[in-house]
Amino acid sequence: MRVTVTAGDPLSTATDLLVLGLWEEESLPSPLDDLIEPGDWSGKAKQTLLIYPRGALPARRVLLIGLGKRSAPDLDQMREVAAIATQRARELKVDRFAFVIPVLSEQTPETVAAAITEGSLLGSYRFLEYKSDLKPEDRREVDELTLLAPVDAVDEAARGIARGGAVARGVNLARDLANLPPNDLTPARLAERARELAVAFDLPITVLGPAEMREQGFGGILAVGQGSVNEPRFIVIDYGAQYADAPTICLAGKGMTFDSGGISIKPAENMDAMKMDMSGAAAVLGALHAIAELRLPLHVVALIGAAENMPGGSAYRPGDILKTLSGKMIEVLNTDAEGRIVLADVLTYAQRYHPSAIIDLATLTGAISVALGPHAIGLFANDDALAQRLVRAGEAAGERAWQLPLWQPYREMVKSEIADVRNATGRQAGAITAAAFLNAFVGDYPWAHLDIAGTAWTDSKPKAYQPKGATGVGVRLLLQALRDWTQA
């Protein structure tokens, strides 16, 4: 769907569908007030009412949508409102529709237009790749959304459309990748998708296979992947190396294309959802897509450890001791705590770039879902300034993060009696000890870990712009944080 902006009087605009957002206390403009019955409209948040003007206006249809109380404007609610409008436009089978940009206190036309664009594109997302019996009309999408703005706000709104569109396309790429079945998205295929992205934006990419990883000493990734016929890959994409004076930010993603648990095998119930155990890698690729589209003046290095964790005659075992890329030794106590082992090598490699910050994203622990549920990302960091930067970005982007502690007693819990660290510590503080394990592999560099295990997948539809399945979480937070970095 193409999104554009134009200036004009909404009530004089000829369109298949005119979307007009109204606050609870806002009066209906004439002649709309004469076209509905008293009591049919209140303006409560997300209420909708479809009106057929029948010649009273140039628009063929008008969709009123409630914005709630004017005293509590909310960009995330604007995303939801835009998603609802777009979905209704698709239901009505219109080719194009217009949306009047509301005025929100403490927000600019750019931020509001960005939120509307995000919500519309995220709300129109559907994963239909494996639906073989759909008719063409069932795959039909709206062609164009036109935002209506005052003349003096058109340029600002256009910038918002560019930003919101890039972010939404990045999120939807991440959703696509995490929704793919594991028989189609193997580590090798994930590397191919990464290469397609790199080629599209003319970015340098390096993909290491098992032989190259063995030669360089990637003992963690190799061990986790050795039980599967689908061999692991290590992927690096380098963006913005020409920005020599800009910070270097490393984005590290866990890319388990399927996680059976290995020898410490998971229960059968819900194991199918473990195709999304590469959501961290998906978020990194989605973010990089948006970064490249927006041409952010930063040096960003995307690093992904991709593997499949399977039981088998060659699988790694509880009791094994692994030598990682850093030289540190890991005692394996549970093969289902594999993501941290993969990330140990990825985080070690990231240090070669001497980054200003390393940010990793991973569906790392079920414990974070128990602690925070589906409403917040678990955030851990060895640098308070970096942590607060990410918290602020999450609030602004609509992807909240909550910081948990990494005190020394937690770091003591991951120490091994017979190796340097152990990959499992029991039930207590599971999300924290997993982060403490990762902390052992980042050196002295500022580092943050985003545990997205509770937010990467949804079996419901918690928000209008968030369908069932992969959420693409992390992309919006990262883009907001990186944009803030360019303005610091």
From Swiss-Prot:
Active site: K266, R340
Positions annotated to bind Mn(2+) 1: D259, D336, E338
GO molecular function, one term: manganese ion binding
Cofactor: Mn(2+)
E.C. code: 3.4.11.1, 3.4.11.10
Catalysis performed (reactions): Release of an N-terminal amino acid, Xaa-|-Yaa-, in which Xaa is preferably Leu, but may be other amino acids including Pro although not Arg or Lys, and Yaa may be Pro. Amino acid amides and methyl esters are also readily hydrolyzed, but rates on arylamides are exceedingly low; Release of an N-terminal amino acid, preferentially leucine, but not glutamic or aspartic acids
Designated name of the protein: Probable cytosol aminopeptidase
CDD domains, A to Z: Peptidase_M17
Gene: pepA
Cofactor: binding details: Binds 2 manganese ions per subunit.
PANTHER family reported for this sequence: CYTOSOL AMINOPEPTIDASE, LEUCINE AMINOPEPTIDASE-RELATED
Source species of the chain: Roseiflexus castenholzii (strain DSM 13941 / HLO8)
Main location: cytoplasm
Family indicated by similarity: Belongs to the peptidase M17 family.
Protein purpose: Presumably involved in the processing and regular turnover of intracellular proteins. Catalyzes the removal of unsubstituted N-terminal amino acids from various peptides.
Protein's UniProt keywords contain Phosphoprotein: no
